A protein has these predicted regions:
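Extracellular disulfide-rich cysteine clusters
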Residues: 1-88
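Mature extracellular or lumenal effector domains of secreted proteins
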Residues: 84-287
Length: 287
């Protein structure tokens, strides 16, 4: 089966060449299909250069979408082929990040980790099935991360959906407008256009923290009040370290991340409001 590619006609990538394979007509090497076969057999290969005239096949370990890649244009004989990503899709939404609760890996650290590409076709078959699902009862050993976070501007993201799941059921969500935003700036109250939390977009609603970096070990925070631990209240909190910042409501488990959200359609008191501990936080984009 031929791998499906994103194709960039008239371009030739110069960075990170692994191998250049000349055309051998007698062995039927002068096809894109054969060239893609070489790439599939090389775990480091992420991009193919193919010369449509000579049939030369070049394998590279640098994505055409990386900012540090060197690419020449207006070369009519060449085409760059990058295998399309294997990120899961749910309707019109594509998953770009899936935080898994309780695996003792900080969610924010992996979100910002530019070396992680779980959707790369050379490794996607080794990703546990649970990581491609929104159901936390199916085992997943990582925070699933795709190349979309590094190539955000290229994809033209229009909206972002943050979904929170417990045993496969969505228990909370926020939709953000993302025209002109980056992979970090979308998470801001000015971009919110819809939410399952009725008071999140109310005219009189205020936030003491609304941001991915949050506060100390609390990340992906949408919070209303820090008034001393018993008075803290908000909508979303990802505690990225055992024990968090020391409040009793952060100590519900010995493992992290500890992902908390409100059980109702409004903000909750983290101590007395009986918040939901979710097992999956998914960040999805509409392209």
């Amino acid at each position: 089966m031929v791998t499906v590619f994103d194709r960039y006609f008239g371009y030739h990538i110069l960075s990170g060449m692994l191998e250049s394979i000349p055309c051998q007509p007698s062995d039927n090497y002068c096809t894109v299909a054969k060239c893609s076969g070489h790439c599939r057999c090389n775990a480091a290969c992420v991009v193919i250069n193919f010369n449509t005239v000579t049939g030369v096949c070049q394998l590279h370990d640098a994505s055409v979408l990386n900012n540090n890649a060197t690419v020449e244009g207006n070369v009519t004989d060449w085409v760059i082929l990058e295998p399309q990503n294997g990120a899961p899709k749910f309707g019109e939404w594509t998953v770009v990040f899936r935080a898994t609760a309780g695996i003792n890996q900080p969610a924010l650290e992996e979100y910002m980790n530019s070396t992680r590409r779980d959707d790369q076709y050379t490794i996607v078959n080794n990703v546990p099935a649970g990581c491609l699902s929104l159901n936390g009862s199916i085992p997943c050993d990582r925070h699933y991360r795709t190349r979309h976070l590094e190539t955000w501007d290229h994809w033209g993201v229009s909206q972002v959906l943050l979904g929170l799941y417990k045993d496969g059921d969505m228990v909370g969500n926020v939709t953000f407008d993302c025209n002109g935003c980056s992979f970090t700036s979308w998470f801001h109250y000015n971009h919110v256009i819809a939410s399952s939390w009725n008071d999140l977009t109310a005219p009189n609603t205020t936030y003491n923290i609304f941001g991915i970096e949050g506060y100390r070990t609390r990340h992906f925070v949408i919070n209303d009040v820090y008034g001393g631990c018993p008075n803290d209240q908000g909508w979303l909190m990802v505690v990225d370290q055992t024990g968090g910042d020391g409040c009793p409501w952060e100590n519900g488990t010995s493992s992290f991340p500890y992902i908390l959200t409100t059980r109702t359609g409004t903000r909750t008191n983290w101590t007395y409001g009986n918040p939901v501990v979710v097992d999956v936080m998914a960040i999805m984009v509409k392209l």
